[in-house]
Amino acid sequence: MATIAAPPVDRNASERKFYSRMAIFLIAVVFIGFAPSFYLRDIVPSYPRPNPTLPPAVLFHGLMFTLWMALLIIQTQLVSTRRVETHMRLGKAAMFLAIALIPVMYVTAVWGVARESHPPFTDGLNWTAIPLAVIPAFSFLIYEAWRRRREAQWHKRLMLGATILFVAGPGFSRIPLAPPTFWGFTIQLLVGTTLMFAPLFFWDRKTQGKIHPATRTGYLVAIATAVVPLALIYTGSWAGIAAKLPGVGA
């Protein structure tokens, strides 16, 4: 009797599924974090934190950030369906969006002083350390991802790490899971950052037997992006510098 050979197993199928699910997971966290203040504003109750009005600049920032998250899911789906050429072409547009996000992040951060959108445990000037710290970290990870765009294992992890910078801080830390104190926020931010990277840690261990250097790089950058501004807020040493930044309080 002739034996019918089983079709070869697609070794990349599990990887494509993993990154698709990671994208969906991150988008879900962002939606939950920003639903009361942006996506479902005036529809669902707001979280117990400052919820000022949304001027055009903040709305624009939110739309660009949403577009970035949408591109993440589109890109993972393109890879999942093996449309790699389309993925690479769209990747060029994503890089332009990443560059455009940088000045928008800056403006939104410094204008937040006048909006008084900071939490109760600090003041508006010191609080700018949190969103401003994301800018060099995001820029570095995006640059490295672009430089290593031909190295798939590096590229996809660095892009994911850059996106987690948005999700762990601005997104996850908005969810009222800890007391609205400095240490409550600190614990939630650091734990949230680690939780965002945890699936990638497990995936690396499962598929490579060790943590991939790109994953380690992204995680260390993300932790530094949290620890450094938190230290500046704790000591109150950032306010004097922030007060001299262009656009503060505009």
Report each predicted region and the residues it spans.
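Short aromatic-rich membrane-water interface segments that cap or initiate transmembrane helices
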Residues: R49-L63, P120-L132, V248-A250
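Interfacial loop-to-transmembrane junctions
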Residues: D204-T225
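Central hydrophobic cores of alpha-helical transmembrane segments in multi-pass inner-membrane proteins
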Residues: M64-T76
